């Protein structure tokens, strides 16, 4: 049982998969929903301070390196372009926009991407952590409901025809 909890915890730390993949895996392994949810939130949030503090510095450092330069340039350019577009649309509501970006469980919109975007946009650390925490909590609720079949049951209940 402990092995399954550790597996889910570490899966929730993996970029792209994050808690969006860890919650269904945990429930599929027969783990209880609430402990799985909290464990996945913790695992998903654990890398956030490190990403904020070091990812941008690493990308800038690697920008002109022959081996990793193309990847670093791609990440910086993509992050700045997307971040500036988000900033232009959100204006003063950038923290809320980042929360919603992280909270909608779609590929590429998790805490890793949100934290990197916040770092590239020079958002305050506190605002990035708050937005990511809110977004991870929201994504976890959505994934938990979807994984336990509640969303499917509600859509069947309220379907027309």
Located regions from the model:
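Membrane-interfacial helix-loop-helix
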Residues: 1-9, 29-102, 126-127, 133, ...
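Transmembrane helix boundary and interhelical junction motifs in multipass membrane proteins
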Residues: 13-25, 105-116
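Interfacial loop-to-transmembrane junctions
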Residues: 118-141
């Amino acid at each position: 049982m402990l092995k399954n909890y550790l597996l889910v915890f570490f899966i929730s730390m993996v970029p792209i998969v994050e808690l969006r993949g860890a919650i269904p895996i945990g429930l599929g392994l027969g783990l209880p929903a609430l402990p799985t949810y909290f464990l996945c939130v913790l695992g998903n949030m654990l890398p956030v301070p490190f990403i904020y503090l070091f990812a941008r510095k690493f990308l800038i450092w690697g920008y002109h390196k022959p081996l990793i330069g193309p990847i670093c340039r791609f990440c910086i350019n993509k992050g700045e372009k997307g971040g500036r577009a988000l900033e232009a649309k959100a204006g003063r509501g950038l923290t809320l926009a980042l929360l919603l970006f992280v909270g909608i469980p779609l590929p590429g919109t998790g805490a890793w991407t949100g934290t990197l975007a916040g770092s590239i946009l020079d958002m305050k650390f506190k605002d990035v952590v708050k937005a990511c925490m809110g977004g991870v909590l929201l994504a976890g609720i959505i994934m938990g409901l979807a994984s336990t079949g509640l969303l499917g049951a509600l859509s069947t209940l309220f379907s027309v025809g």
